[in-house]
Amino acid sequence: MPKIVDHDRYRKELLTKSFDLFAEKGYATVTMRQIAQALGVSTGTLYHYFPSKEVVFEQLLEELTRLDILSISEQLKEEETLLGRIRGSFKLLETHREYFLKQALLIADFRQQQRRDGQESQVFQRIYDQVENLIPELFGIDDPTLTKFLMIYVDGLIWQDVYGCNCVDHQSQEDLICEMVTMYLEKHGLQQE
C-alpha cells in the first residue's frame, strides 16, 4: 500500500525546521543544497515543495507568523482586559526573546539581500496587514492609531535586543506601556475591553 503523505503538513515541517539554519547562517549565505542537507531531504524533494530559496524563506516567515498568532491567541484567551492582554503579550515576548531576536535579524538580512538585488518582496506587507488586522480582535481595541503604536513599540523592544545593549527592563516597559495606553484611552474616551 502506498505511503499517504499530508503534503501541506510536511511542507510546514520543512519550513519550521529550516528556521534554525537560516538563523545560524543568515539568508544571504544559505543555499538550497544546504537547506536540503540540514532537513535531511534530497534537493529534488526540496524543489518539489519550494521552487527557490526566496520562496522557502517567504513561506517560512508566513508560517512563523501563523504559529506566532496561534501562540499569542492561546496566551491571551483567558485575559479579560486590554491591560491583561498587553501584559500577557509582554510575558510571551520575554519568554521567547531569543526567538524574536533571531527572527528580526533574519528579516533584516533578507531585506538587505532584496534591496541589493533590486527586488521587493510583498511578504512583509502581507504579514504586516495580517497582524494589523488581527490586533483589534486579539486586544479588543478598535483604534488604528493605537494598533500601529503597539506594533511599533513591540518592534522597538525587539530591536533593542538586536543592538545588544541588554539595557531594556521589560517589566518597566510593560508598566509604562500599560500606563500610556490607559491615559490614551481615557483622553480619547475609549473603553478598555
Question: Could you say what each language-model-derived stretch is?
Answer:
Residues 2, 13, 17, 21-55, ...:
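Helix-turn-helix
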Residues 59, 63, 72-99, 147-150, ...:
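Hydrophobic alpha-helical connector segments
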Residues 1-9, 189-193:
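N-terminal intrinsically disordered/low-complexity leader segments
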Residues 94-118:
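Amphipathic alpha-helical segments used for helix-helix packing
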Residues 5, 28-29, 140-144:
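Short, charged helix-capping/linker segments at alpha-helix termini
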Residues 95-99, 113, 150-171, 183-191:
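Amphipathic C-terminal alpha-helical segment
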Residues 11, 15, 61, 65, ...:
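Amphipathic, non-transmembrane alpha-helical scaffold segments
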Residues 114-148, 175-182:
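Amphipathic alpha-helical packing segments from all-alpha helical-bundle domains
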